[in-house]
Amino acid sequence: MTARPDFEKFIVIVTYGRSGSTLLQTALQTIPGAMIRGENNNLLYPLFRAWKRAHNTRYNQGQTPIPAHGPWYGADEIVPRRFGEELAGLFVREILKPTSQTRVLGFKEIRFHDAEPGEMPEFLDFIREFFPPCRLVFNTRRAADVARSSWWKDVETEKVMEMVEDLDRQYADYVAAHSDTSFLVRYDDYVKDRASLRALFDFLGEAYDEAAIEAAFARRLPH
């Protein structure tokens, strides 16, 4: 088993397109030793699905020893926990690529809602389980402002707003159920008042550097 690169904390920004998440990502980069990567096209989702299939195979078809002539031969020897840890380690090493100076690792993703209906909470549980110690930061924005973005120009405004409002409810429900490892922020709040991010930094157990935050917000984003 290949050892996973070491880090103190793992932070994942959970959101949707044009929520201001790149600004939040930049703000979290002010944490000393932080490497918060950008999007990866929801690459972790198929890894979660692979782990889920392994888990279901082991505990549905492999509950008892299976002989060599059995159709599920070997299913009883699958170790879902170890498989999940290997997938997580591979994702960290080959996708996030932390350096020896990385103390806080993570990424942001705007495609969590690509999960099958009702599956996102289970996907998030997988992340918390296999990337410890993990903190999920849910980033929201006013639905009407998201829908006005040209990024959503090929989708009807009402559909975008419905999606955002539904995701906001799902985010709030998840945070309420996992308040020890999850936190909710609103772009509309911190873009007007940087200090509103202090609560997030307190939750993460990190110092809030006002000057560094101001510099991060002043930096022009590439999109």
For each predicted feature, which ranges?
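PAPS-dependent sulfotransferase catalytic domain
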Residues: 55-59, 98-210
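PAPS-dependent sulfotransferase catalytic core
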Residues: 1-93, 210-212, 216-223
